[in-house]
Amino acid sequence: APPGFTPFRS
């Protein structure tokens, strides 16, 4: 995954 990628955003 690229830097700063998140599978979810809270």
Curated annotation (Swiss-Prot):
Cellular localization per UniProt: Secreted
GO biological process: defense response; vasodilation
Regions annotated as coiled coil: none
Single GO molecular function: toxin activity
Top-rank taxon, per record: Eukaryota
Cellular component GO terms, alphabetical: extracellular region
Keywords from the UniProt entry: Amphibian defense peptide, G-protein coupled receptor impairing toxin, Secreted, Toxin, Vasoactive, Vasodilator
Expression sites (tissue/organ): Expressed by the skin glands.
Family according to the record: Belongs to the bradykinin-related peptide family.
Function as written in the Swiss-Prot or TrEMBL entry: Produces in vitro relaxation of rat arterial smooth muscle and constriction of intestinal smooth muscle. May target bradykinin receptors (BDKRB).
Name of this chain's protein: [Ala1,Thr6]-bradykinyl-Ser
Taxonomy of the source species: Eukaryota, Metazoa, Chordata, Craniata, Vertebrata
